[in-house]
Amino acid sequence: WKVIWTSEDTKQSGVDRLHDLISEHPDVTALICNGDMVALGACLALQSKNLQPGKDISVIGFDNVMDAQLVTPSLTTMAVNPYNLGQILAETILKRINETEHPQITYFNNPELIIRNSAGPA
Protein backbone atom coordinates (compact mmCIF):
# COMPACT_ATOMS: atom_id res chain seq x y z
CA TRP A 1 0.00 0.00 0.00
CA LYS A 2 1.01 3.61 -0.25
CA VAL A 3 0.14 6.79 1.60
CA ILE A 4 0.56 10.21 0.03
CA TRP A 5 0.47 13.38 2.11
CA THR A 6 1.28 16.90 1.13
CA SER A 7 3.46 19.07 3.31
CA GLU A 8 5.51 22.22 3.39
CA ASP A 9 9.23 21.77 2.77
CA THR A 10 10.28 22.31 6.39
CA LYS A 11 11.83 20.20 9.12
CA GLN A 12 8.83 20.82 11.37
CA SER A 13 6.51 19.53 8.66
CA GLY A 14 8.60 16.35 8.47
CA VAL A 15 8.42 15.91 12.24
CA ASP A 16 4.65 16.45 12.30
CA ARG A 17 3.93 14.21 9.32
CA LEU A 18 6.13 11.40 10.63
CA HIS A 19 4.24 11.37 13.94
CA ASP A 20 0.93 11.24 12.01
CA LEU A 21 2.23 8.47 9.75
CA ILE A 22 3.55 6.28 12.56
CA SER A 23 0.33 6.58 14.55
CA GLU A 24 -1.86 5.73 11.53
CA HIS A 25 0.48 3.20 9.86
CA PRO A 26 2.82 1.69 12.48
CA ASP A 27 4.12 -0.92 10.02
CA VAL A 28 5.50 1.63 7.52
CA THR A 29 8.97 0.69 6.20
CA ALA A 30 9.93 3.60 3.94
CA LEU A 31 9.37 7.32 3.32
CA ILE A 32 9.99 9.26 0.13
CA CYS A 33 9.80 12.94 0.99
CA ASN A 34 9.10 15.93 -1.26
CA GLY A 35 12.23 17.69 -0.02
CA ASP A 36 15.31 17.12 2.07
CA MET A 37 14.08 19.41 4.85
CA VAL A 38 10.97 17.24 5.27
CA ALA A 39 13.16 14.11 5.25
CA LEU A 40 15.52 15.60 7.84
CA GLY A 41 12.55 16.41 10.07
CA ALA A 42 11.24 12.87 9.63
CA CYS A 43 14.64 11.49 10.65
CA LEU A 44 14.62 13.65 13.79
CA ALA A 45 11.14 12.40 14.66
CA LEU A 46 12.19 8.78 14.11
CA GLN A 47 15.20 9.22 16.39
CA SER A 48 12.96 10.77 19.07
CA LYS A 49 10.98 7.50 18.96
CA ASN A 50 14.20 5.44 19.27
CA LEU A 51 13.91 4.32 15.64
CA GLN A 52 16.90 4.45 13.30
CA PRO A 53 16.52 5.95 9.83
CA GLY A 54 17.97 3.48 7.35
CA LYS A 55 17.55 0.53 9.68
CA ASP A 56 14.00 0.63 11.05
CA ILE A 57 12.53 2.90 8.35
CA SER A 58 14.19 4.04 5.13
CA VAL A 59 14.04 7.78 4.42
CA ILE A 60 14.76 9.43 1.06
CA GLY A 61 14.73 13.16 0.39
CA PHE A 62 14.81 15.33 -2.70
CA ASP A 63 17.16 18.31 -3.33
CA ASN A 64 20.54 17.25 -1.91
CA VAL A 65 20.79 20.23 0.43
CA MET A 66 24.11 20.64 2.22
CA ASP A 67 22.70 19.37 5.52
CA ALA A 68 21.83 16.04 3.85
CA GLN A 69 25.42 14.85 4.02
CA LEU A 70 26.19 16.41 7.41
CA VAL A 71 23.51 14.75 9.56
CA THR A 72 23.71 11.33 11.19
CA PRO A 73 22.72 9.16 9.49
CA SER A 74 23.50 10.96 6.24
CA LEU A 75 20.42 11.39 4.05
CA THR A 76 19.79 9.45 0.83
CA THR A 77 18.45 11.97 -1.68
CA MET A 78 17.73 12.82 -5.29
CA ALA A 79 20.01 15.58 -6.59
CA VAL A 80 18.48 17.66 -9.37
CA ASN A 81 21.25 20.20 -10.09
CA PRO A 82 19.49 23.54 -9.48
CA TYR A 83 22.25 25.41 -11.32
CA ASN A 84 21.42 23.49 -14.50
CA LEU A 85 17.69 24.07 -13.99
CA GLY A 86 18.29 27.81 -13.59
CA GLN A 87 20.36 27.93 -16.75
CA ILE A 88 17.67 26.09 -18.72
CA LEU A 89 15.01 28.45 -17.36
CA ALA A 90 17.02 31.55 -18.31
CA GLU A 91 17.65 30.24 -21.84
CA THR A 92 13.96 29.39 -22.25
CA ILE A 93 12.84 32.86 -21.13
CA LEU A 94 15.28 34.56 -23.51
CA LYS A 95 14.05 32.40 -26.42
CA ARG A 96 10.44 33.26 -25.60
CA ILE A 97 11.26 36.99 -25.51
CA ASN A 98 13.21 36.95 -28.78
CA GLU A 99 11.03 34.64 -30.90
CA THR A 100 7.50 35.19 -32.16
CA GLU A 101 6.70 31.47 -32.32
CA HIS A 102 6.42 29.66 -29.01
CA PRO A 103 6.54 25.93 -29.66
CA GLN A 104 6.45 23.57 -26.73
CA ILE A 105 9.95 22.93 -25.41
CA THR A 106 10.95 19.82 -23.49
CA TYR A 107 14.14 19.68 -21.47
CA PHE A 108 15.55 16.80 -19.51
CA ASN A 109 17.45 17.26 -16.31
CA ASN A 110 19.12 14.03 -15.24
CA PRO A 111 18.60 13.65 -11.50
CA GLU A 112 21.04 11.55 -9.53
CA LEU A 113 20.17 9.22 -6.67
CA ILE A 114 22.75 9.79 -3.95
CA ILE A 115 22.72 6.75 -1.71
CA ARG A 116 23.76 7.45 1.84
CA ASN A 117 22.86 5.92 5.19
CA SER A 118 19.19 6.84 5.70
CA ALA A 119 17.91 4.18 3.30
CA GLY A 120 18.43 0.47 3.36
CA PRO A 121 16.51 -2.77 3.71
CA ALA A 122 14.00 -1.97 6.43
Regions found by a protein language model. Give the residues of each.
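Bacterial carbohydrate/catabolite-sensing allosteric modules
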Residues: 1-122
